[in-house]
Amino acid sequence: MKLLLLSALLGCLATAYAAPAEGIVKWCVKSEQELRKCHDLAAKVAEFSCVRKDGSFECIQAIKGGEADAITLDGGDIYTAGLTNYGLQPIIAEDYGEDSDTCYYAVAVAKKGTAFGFKTLRGKKSCHTGLGKSAGWNIPIGTLVTESQIRWAGIEDRPVESAVSDFFNASCAPGATMGSKLCQLCKGDCSRSHKEPYYDYAGAFQCLKDGAGDVAFIKPLAVPAAEKASYELLCKDGTRASIDSYKTCHLARVPAHAVVSRKDPELANRIYNKLVAVKDFNLFSSDGYAAKNLMFKDSAQKLVQLPTTTDSFLYLGAEYMSTIRSLKKSQATGASSRAIKWCAVGHAEKGKCDTWTINSFADGESKISCQDAPTVEECIKKIMRKEADAIAVDGGEVYTAGKCGLVPVMVEQYDADLCSAPGEASSYYAVAVAKKGSGLTWKTLKGKRSCHTGLGRTAGWNIPMGLIHQETNDCDFTKYFSKGCAPGSEVGSPFCAQCKGSGKAVGDEYRCKARSEEQYYGYTGAFRCLVEDAGDVAFIKHTIVPESTDGNGPDWAKDLKSSDFELLCQDGTTQPVTKFSECHLAKVPAHAVITRPETRGDVVSILLELQAKFGSSGSDSSFRMFQSSVEKNLLFKDSTKCLQEIPKGTKYQDFLGKEYMIAMQSLRKCSDSTSDLEKACTFHSCQQKE
C-alpha cells in the first residue's frame, strides 16, 4: 500500500514539474552572442529557454522536430522554412515603425567618391549579409540576373553562385563554400552566423567600411547615422543618391523578418503572448553582446501577429517568391505547351473540367488541363503559386483576387445581342426574393432567416449585407438575421445553421462549405434554401427564379411557378420577379475570369479559341462551356452567352466600378467580413495592390 502511495505521489510530482515545460517557449539561437542574450531573457522571463544551433537551417530542422519552437528569420530563410519538407510558417512579423512598418528596403551602398554605379558592378568586390538572404543576396542577385548583368542560363547549366563568382572580382557571402571566391573577402570562417565578422547587415557594412569590398547589399539603417555622409546608395538607373533617399533609390521593398514556428495555432498564440508580455528586457537591442540584430533586428519597434492562415508564400508575396524562384529556376515554365490550367471547385466542376479537357484534344495535346481545390480561395492561392492559371469568379472574389495581385481578363456576357456588338459592360441585378404572400418586405427582414449564395459573394452577401451595414452600422449580422445559410461561414455560426450539406445522413463534411456539394451553395442553392423553407429570404441573381421555375429547373423545382415568388424592393414594396430592373438591391458587374498579370495573353487567346469551338453557338456540339448537366453553373454561369475580353490594363477596382467599391469599403469596416486570404494578402504595405 505504501509503495502504491509513493508511486502515486511521485507521479503527481512528475506531472507538477513537467507541466510548466508545456508553457515554455524554446528559442533557437545561432551564435554565442545570441545565446548570451537569450539566457539573459530567460533569466528575466522563466517561460523562455534557449536552444543553440550552428545556423538558420539547423534551427529550422530543430523546430520541425520539436527540439525548438521559434526563431526570427529573414525572407530567404522563411522561404526555406515553408518548403514541404519542413512545413513551418511565419506567425509574427517585426514592425519597423511608420516609415516602413512590416517591410524594409533592400539597397546597394558604396563609399562616396567611388566612380561606379549599379549598372557597372562587374569586376567589383561585393559584401553580402549572407547567402540566400533577402537584402544581401536574393534581391541584388535576382535583380542583376533579371537585368542580364549576371549571365546565367539556369541551375541545369551551373549553380547561380558560380555565375556570381564570375561577375564579381571577389566577395564575402557568408554561407558560401569555404575557399571559394564568394568567401574570399570574409574575415572569419565564412559561416552564416555571427562567428563570421562580416555576417548580417552590420557585418556586410563593416566589410565595405574596412575596404574589403566596393559595394554592400544591406538595408539603409545598417549605415550608422554618424557615417551616412561618407556613403551613397546605388540606384537601379545607374545614378547615386544619399543614404536617406532610400525611398526613391532602392532595389526592392521586401517583407520584414518574421518569427517562424510549426503550424500549430495554440503554439503560435503562446509564443506571441509570451513575447508581448516581456517586461524589463529590450528584445530589440543587442547592446553589450558584441554583435547586432540578435534574436530580432535592432531596428524593430514592435511585433505584429500574422493572420492564422498566413504561410510563407502569402507572407513573402508573389513578386518576392518569383525572385527566389528565378534564382532556383523552380518557377513553372509551361511556355512550350501553352495549355492553361483551369481551377475547378469540387467534384462536379472537376468532372466538367475533365470533359472539357478531353474534348479540347487536338494534335496530341489539349489547350486546357484541370486542377481542383475545395474552395475558390484555395483556387486563388493556386493561381498565385502558378499551380493553376485561371478560374471564373463572382465580383466579391474578383475583389479578393485583386487584393492578392491577380487581374480580371474576361467577363461573362449574359446578353447574346451584346456578344457581337459589345457596348455597356456586362452586368446583372442583385435581388432579394421571398415567397409571394409571406408579408415580408425589405423593412421587416430583421429576425428572419436568410439564404445566401456564399460568404463574400456579390449578390448573396456583399450587396445585401453592405446595405444592411449602412443602415445599422453594426457588424454583427447575427443580431439582424436569426439564422440562415451562408456557405463558407464558420462552422457553428448561425449562418451555418440552415445549411443542408450533401444530403448524407451522418458525417457530412460538406455542410456549410462553399462548394457545389453543399446543396444550398450558389445561386440555385440559395433559392432552394428558400423553396425548402430553410430561410425566409434569398439573396440571388435576377435570372435565377425564371431559370429554376415554370418547368425550367431541376427535379426539386419541377412543380414551382415563378409567380409564387416576389422581389423585395428597398423602398419596402414588393414586385413580381419580372420587374428586376425597377426592384433590385444593386446592378453589379458580371462574373469574370481571373489570372496572373503575366499569363493574361495566353488565357485570353486560348479561351477565345475554345469559345469559338465550345461556346453557345460553337462549331463543336460535343461539349458546351456554358451548360451544366449534373448541377447548375459549373465553371461558368449557365446564363453566359459568351466571354468578352476585358481591356488590357483594367484594374480590378475599375472593373468592379465605383458603387461596388464603395459597398465593399463599407463592408470591410467589419473585420469579420474580410477573409483570412485577403487579410494575408494585404498585411504588408509593400504587398498591397492599389
From Swiss-Prot:
In the UniProt record, the signal sequence range is 1-18
InterPro entries associated with the record: Transferrin, Transferrin-like_dom, Transferrin_Fe_BS
Gene Ontology biological process terms, A to Z? antibacterial humoral response; iron ion transport
Disulfide topology: 28-50, 127-207, 172-186, 235-249, 343-379, 353-370, 404-681, 419-642, 451-529, 475-670, 485-499, 496-512, 569-583
The residues listed in the UniProt record as binding Fe(3+) 1, with positions renumbered to this chain, are: 74, 104, 201, 257
At which positions is Fe(3+) 2 bound?
394, 428, 523, 591
* Carbohydrate-modified residues: 169
Q: What broad taxonomic lineage does this protein's source fall under?
A: Eukaryota, Metazoa, Chordata, Craniata, Vertebrata
| Protein localization | Secreted
Q: Where does hydrogencarbonate 2 bind?
A: 453, 457, 459-460
Q: How does it assemble?
A: Monomer.
Instruction: Print the keywords alphabetically.
Output: Disulfide bond, Glycoprotein, Ion transport, Iron, Iron transport, Metal-binding, Repeat, Secreted, Signal, Transport
Query: Member of which family?
Result: Belongs to the transferrin family.
Q: In which tissues is it expressed?
A: Abundant in liver and serum with smaller amounts found in the stomach and kidney.
Q: Which residues form a coiled coil?
A: none
What protein name is recorded for this chain? Answer: Serotransferrin-1
Ligand binding (hydrogencarbonate 1): 129, 134, 136-137
Q: Which organism is the protein's source?
A: Salmo salar (Atlantic salmon)
Tell me the Gene3D superfamilies matching this sequence.
Answer: Periplasmic binding protein-like II
